[in-house]
């Protein structure tokens, strides 16, 4: 049988506003779930990979070891194609490794293609606070006290933490199971402190983005979360200007 070759038009119709490399932890269950909602219909599309982990217990040592997996994880994302942004989706790993080191490893992972920008939730929360003129936060995490303290210390000197709370759950397989009602209760309780104007819920593996609008209305505070600010920074770096509704006031603003 003769097989006929037919003409085809080549046109990027799914990621026309941005190709995003998204590096997830092996244990991550929530980032894609929340990004699918936030980035829907934007034409900014994420192409994920995952990093191996020495343990599901997020100790400083396990978080630091992720550094050794970043280059190989980046290389598996659309080999040979330019990426507008690559994001490491882990707040605590980005803090532990260092945001400059994360960016260096990712950008140098493949000399044969361009990676235009790099972000992560830890650098994104700092940029978001600068964008909103915020210099004080209340912080809620699922981490150990040790890792939580590292998050707080790394915010200094530009961002002061007024209050901090943790669910103290170091097993990252269990963090996604922390019920949204528990997270909401923690936010509402912290918001009772009149000195706190902004609350940051840290961790990309917490299921909270769909409740940000509700919490901002209940508390009258600005609510920021790891996936929300990372998505905001991705959109900013990809030069996507349109407002995103339903996931907090920061995404409704022009970037």
Predicted stretch roles:
Residues 103-129, 215-230, 234:
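Short, acidic/small-residue loops that bind anionic groups at enzyme active sites
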Residues 2-72, 143-179:
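N-terminal glycine-rich anion-binding loop in soluble enzyme alpha/beta folds
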